[in-house]
């Protein structure tokens, strides 16, 4: 991946230009890759390590996005910074293609700056139907699931585009703070994530 193709999450959040990787560029890098887009630009990140299901995806400038079952559970090196997000109880995100409409999720967020710790947020999931989604040069028919977040100053929607066969989240838009969301697109998934759930 060339230097011009890899930009950090920090750049994405601070208004640097977007990055549009090609299928050939992604294929040339042996590591799993995601594209993360903030309010004003994008970054390509590679999978660095996995610890008990928590994946750490790194940019060239060492900004990090942490995912678990495709859900953003932390960021590092950007502002705002999601220091931690935990789900209370069982996570529906491991098999999002099988959820019942109206399923609720209890979340707890720790966000910097301003030491916003322990923010309790309820997510309500709704199945919106199948949609065609373009990723690189492929078109996929994916199940669109919306999660409406409310509580503790939050009023945002998360969106997930999920493989209807195995529940893998190919694309999502997820809040990392009450006023900031990231778009995450799987360019070259970690192969074990594609197994049936």
Indicate residue ranges for each PLM-predicted region.
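Residues that form generic nucleotide/phosphate-binding pockets
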Residues: 96
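Acidic, serine/threonine-rich low-complexity disordered tracts
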Residues: 1-83, 99-197
